[in-house]
Amino acid sequence: MASTTSDKATPERRAELLQNLAETKICFAEASKSLSHAPTLVAVSKTKPAWMTRACYEEGQRDFGENSDIDLVNKAKKLADLESLRWHFIGVMKKTEGDDFRRQARMRELTMVSNLHAIQSLTSIEDADIYNGAIPADRKTPLNMLLQVNTSGEIQKSGLQYVDTEAEAADSPLFKLACYIIEHCPKLHFQGLMTIGSQTESLASSERPNQDFETLKKTRDVLEGMLRSNPAFNGRWGDNEKLLLSMGMTADFEAGLRAGSHIVRVGTGIFGARRMK
């Protein structure tokens, strides 16, 4: 796919962007052929200008993601006229000493985005409470929540520990958070799990199954079994009691789809490399 260092709204840059989107959709469709469900392509623009999101929307793309809550809120304001656009927040609001008040204010501002479809990076009960309490009263549907799982074990990556067995999961932060959302957060909906695979697995994913994705699938299976065993949870999680998986980015989204992912997140492959702020 083509790439460029200029993000100015020129006819040439627009044509390049839309060519990237078209090529991504071709690969997306090919990798999805064996799936029994219809997956979602989330276009992640990161630091790119709002005109690029609008251009992709005009070509039929509807789901867009941002790593930065500030970028998402700002772009949502600029693109408020795009009524069918669905925003996905896939980043992490890191906690810094003395900045907790500001962080909570940003979380509340994020929930004010009327077409915010999902937060794919939840990792704590504390944050679940903040989001649940901040949801506007006029929001018609609960906000979808995907719990981020660290499947690679890399310390630099966010996410909760994966689980292999029900015995292991019973006291795990991951299962406790899932149950907490279902039981105590009526304005949130526990929809699924998200992971960011390691570079090593991404590079090898064309030759063999991506082990990070296999780990997430196993974790999904364990959680589904435990949630289904509780009659009080019936109909209160997932999509028809099936947890959605968000796994796969530019370098490995095709492997993610082959592994059964419901959502893939493609940034560089569509928009080009991010700009340094």
PLM regions and their residue ranges:
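Conserved alpha/beta-domain cores
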Residues: A2-A251, L257-A259, F271-A273
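Gly/Pro- and small hydrophobic-enriched strand-loop and loop-to-helix capping segments
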Residues: S261-K277
